[in-house]
């Protein structure tokens, strides 16, 4: 499936030294997927070494549109905060 990156996502990749391989691995083989009900996007999560990558994207006409992404070392804390307040709902 084709993948497009927003300017914002490309800037985050460059500034945060996110590896392209990590991005594609997260899209193809996520550990978890959440629906961000506040923004109408999907959020893929994948552990990569000691960090986790969080990737927000939309599916439009068969194209994956990556909106933003970042690494975190505090995944459990983030997921708890987002799911408890109902911002994210687990779909996978």
Q: Residue spans of the language-model regions?
A:
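Ribonuclease/tRNase effector modules and their secretory precursors
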Residues: 1-92
